Amino acid sequence: MTDWIGQFPKELQDRIQAVVSRDASSQQVFIDVINFIEKEESNKRRKLASGLGLAEDSNDAVGSSLDELSPSPTIHPDTIIFEIPQVSFMSPVRKRMNLTFHLIEQNGQGLPVLSIVNPANNSPDISYINLQNAVKLCLILPILGNSTNPLKKGVVTLCCWMHDLYYTDVNVSKDPLILQLNLDAIKKLMIKSEKLPADIENQFDLTNYRNSVILNPIQERIIDYFTRQFKLCGVNLVSYLPSDTIVKNSFIVNQDTAVALSTSGNDSTKPAMVMVECHKGARDGNLILLEQNEHNPAYILFAFRKPTLVYAISRVLSASYTSVTKHTFSLTIIVLNEKDEERSIEFSIIDQAYFQLIDDFIRSHGISDDSFNEDNKEKVVDSKANVVRAAVNGMLGTTTPATTNSRANGDGGDDDDDEEEDGDFEAGNDDDDSDVAEEYDSAAESVEGEGEEEEEEEEEKEEDVEEEDENNTGKERTKHRNGDVFTRSKEE
């Protein structure tokens, strides 16, 4: 009997030997089976490396060779570190899936892996490894419209972006992880799994939180638990949700169209996060401004429609305010993309009530007035440049964001760059028509279902909006004088 049989347990060796002794030709069958299994495992490892956009033998990318990783087609319960079951993903897939941290073996040690898992067969659809180095930004954010409603404040967004260097395969989607969390539904699941005590609601006086937009102590402890579990797996999860027990995060502005929030340990009057409704071309979304913290540099983001944008503030060269009307304005930033090429990005139909929040952020990072450089002089009428600039500054500086709840009201901006494919876009396939699994909880059904229906209605209107915006763009340019512009750029 050859050495190949030695890889099996003793009992199985005896059974194989008994079969081979009765029929010598069966030995080749066993050898063929072993060769087939080894080939399949090798293909799986290559597929994992390709799916992650990594070189198969890249020690720099993952700390050691991916040849030594042997992921299972299903996740064994004993390997699960932490799991949020059946949550609504918006990206990179669009269905209810499990968000699972689990272990796979590498060099005899457990390696943490973040997987998007199909609950129907417990099989990972997408997996991310080397989390400590791969994750660029991981956030929990309020949802505009939910943050003002005490009944919906617990439905929030978790999003996670990977570093561009993590993807070496240009065919691999760079879409971030974006999913909705229903904290009240998760509370029930955590009680059922004994991660929270069954009498947790009796341990706190929740009376004052029922009509409040601040997280109640139970919701805050769920977020704290998530933060600690993510940290255990090498991911720094930062929460921008209002809370007043474990951490002190406070709303400075909380409207249906914008929020601004200060975080624990920082100046309570200075926002650590600003999020406002805007458009990029014909697509609506959120402009998000993040101050530097202990884990991340300052960022400017556009989310949550595809393609999302993520830029460190150090990559922003200048900012211009244009298309100023009574109610709205546009912000155009010049950035350096990953190829160190300058790129212009316009965010339009921003409620002018939030101009000061945005301008304060721009100014605080050394992006100051540069209206009169040679490039921008062409955009203004020379004889009226000073008058226009002063008038725009005066008009936009008179409204305080805390006293307005008006929605953005204006025409669409220039959509020329909306269809461009750019290396710095977190872009991928925009096939969002996959089926959504059944609701797993009645609480999630009543709250999350409402949000999903609204989102589907928005998507059905998107083609009409794009066509309307294309027609309105010409009107907008005729409507606004060329003099209505001023620009900000980096201080020398």
UniProtKB/Swiss-Prot annotation:
Residues 412-471 have a biased composition (Acidic residues). PANTHER family: FACT COMPLEX SUBUNIT SSRP1, HISTONE CHAPERONE RTT106. The gene is RTT106. This is Histone chaperone RTT106. Residues 392-492 are annotated as: Disordered. Residues 472-492 have a biased composition (Basic and acidic residues). Interacts with histones H3 and H4. GO terms for cellular component: chromosome; nucleus.
